[in-house]
Each structure stands twice: as structure tokens, then as C-alpha cells.
């Protein structure tokens, strides 16, 4: 469920040494499955352990995860990174904003997951996003661009060389192409 690097485990052991005996760490997601999802790590004293918590054992400590957060912490990683500017704890949870879907889920759910977890985070660097409108009976994913992508002069390249290639590679035999139905209006909001 959660991978904690050796450096992060050593960091937690050091921090927990100054806490009352029996204190663990808690890894959680606030507003899981939403665009506002935020992950965190906190101390978990013995009296804060809930009966439905999932207990993960590590070297010298345990991590508690509440039942509601658990599916959103699948594939999460915690690391402790040190560089010339100092050190910091990093927590990456690719499924925090959207629950990972199974490989046998309907095509529309699997495409939505890829859009929300992989494509939109890339487009967000330019203030953009895409939305799946429908999948046609011919297997074409109909998309609508928003934000900085709306009216962007690079939208055709993004669509054909980026998004379409990625989706066709991920869903061979299920998708035949992608189509943009956005009424592009170039303006100050447009990236380029």
C-alpha cells in the first residue's frame, strides 16, 4: 500500500524516540477522491488508534491508515530527501485525488482515471485541463479542453502527439482515436 524509503523510516524512528511510548505515525488523506485532496503524516498516540485502522509494520515503528484513506494511498511513497538546501519529507500519493480503477472497469472509467491522474496534472503546468465528453460507438474519445488549453496555438500538437498517442498506447483495441470538440477562443487565458 505505502512504500516508505529507508531514509524516511530512519527519520520516523528518530522523531518517534522523543514521543511517548507506543506512539506510531498516521498517514491520511483529507478530502480523498476530490481535486482538493491533501495527504499528511502525523503522530498517532496509542489512544488515537481506531479499531478499523490498517496497521502497516516498518523498521522500529508502525504506520496507521484509516479505512477511508486506504484506497487513496495505494502506490503512495514517502521519502526523506537531503540536498544542499536542507532536508524534507516527501509524500507522493498518485491516487489521492481519484481512486485507482481496476483493469476490468468500464473503458470510460479507466480513461477518466488516466485523464485525472496523468494527463491533467501535466496540462495544469500551463493552466489547462481536458474533460472526457463521451466515447463514440467507433471507439473515439471525444475531449474538451479547458483553462489555458482553450485557444492555445499548440492544442493540435498536444492532442495528436501527446494525449492521443498516450491513450491509444494504453487502450489498444479499445480506442481508435481522439477528437477535440472545444470551441477554441484565443484570449489572455490561453497558454500560447
Curated annotation (Swiss-Prot):
Sorted alphabetically, which InterPro entries does this protein's record hold?
Fe/S_biogenesis_protein_NfuA (IPR017726), FeS_biogenesis (IPR000361), FSCA_dom_sf (IPR034904), HesB-like_dom_sf (IPR035903), NIF_FeS_clus_asmbl_NifU_C (IPR001075)
List UniProt keywords, sorted A-Z: 4Fe-4S, Iron, Iron-sulfur, Metal-binding
Q: GO biological process: what's one of them?
A: iron-sulfur cluster assembly
Q: Mention one GO molecular function.
A: 4 iron, 4 sulfur cluster binding
Q: Which domain of life is it from?
A: Bacteria
Q: Which family does it belong to?
A: Belongs to the NfuA family.
Which PANTHER family does this UniProt record tie to the protein? FE_S BIOGENESIS PROTEIN NFUA, IRON-SULFUR CLUSTER SCAFFOLD PROTEIN NFU-RELATED
NCBIfam families per UniProt: PRK11190.1, YhgI_GntY
Which proteins does it associate with, and in what oligomeric form? Homodimer.
Q: What does this protein do?
A: Involved in iron-sulfur cluster biogenesis. Binds a 4Fe-4S cluster, can transfer this cluster to apoproteins, and thereby intervenes in the maturation of Fe/S proteins. Could also act as a scaffold/chaperone for damaged Fe/S proteins.
- Name of this protein: Fe/S biogenesis protein NfuA
Quote the gene name from the UniProt entry. nfuA
Amino acid at each position: 500500500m505505502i512504500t516508505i524509503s529507508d531514509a524516511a523510516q530512519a527519520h520516523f524512528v528518530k522523531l518517534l524516540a522523543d514521543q511517548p511510548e507506543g506512539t506510531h505515525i498516521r498517514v491520511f488523506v483529507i478530502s480523498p477522491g476530490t481535486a482538493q485532496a491533501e495527504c499528511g503524516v502525523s503522530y498517532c498516540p496509542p489512544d488515537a488508534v481506531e479499531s478499523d485502522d490498517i496497521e502497516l509494520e516498518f523498521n522500529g515503528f508502525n504506520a496507521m491508515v484509516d479505512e477511508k484513506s486506504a484506497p487513496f494511498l495505494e502506490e503512495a511513497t514517502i521519502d526523506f530527501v537531503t540536498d544542499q538546501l536542507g532536508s524534507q519529507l516527501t509524500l507522493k500519493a498518485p491516487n489521492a485525488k481519484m481512486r485507482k480503477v481496476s483493469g476490468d472497469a468500464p473503458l470510460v472509467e479507466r480513461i477518466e482515471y488516466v485523464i485525472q491522474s496523468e494527463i491533467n496534472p501535466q496540462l495544469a503546468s500551463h493552466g489547462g485541463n481536458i474533460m472526457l465528453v463521451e466515447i463514440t460507438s467507433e471507439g473515439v474519445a471525444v475531449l474538451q479542453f479547458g483553462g489555458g488549453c482553450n485557444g492555445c496555438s499548440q492544442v493540435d500538437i498536444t492532442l495528436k502527439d501527446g494525449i492521443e498517442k498516450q491513450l491509444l498506447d494504453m487502450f489498444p483495441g479499445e480506442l481508435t482515436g481522439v477528437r477535440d470538440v472545444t470551441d477554441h477562443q484565443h484570449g489572455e487565458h490561453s497558454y500560447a
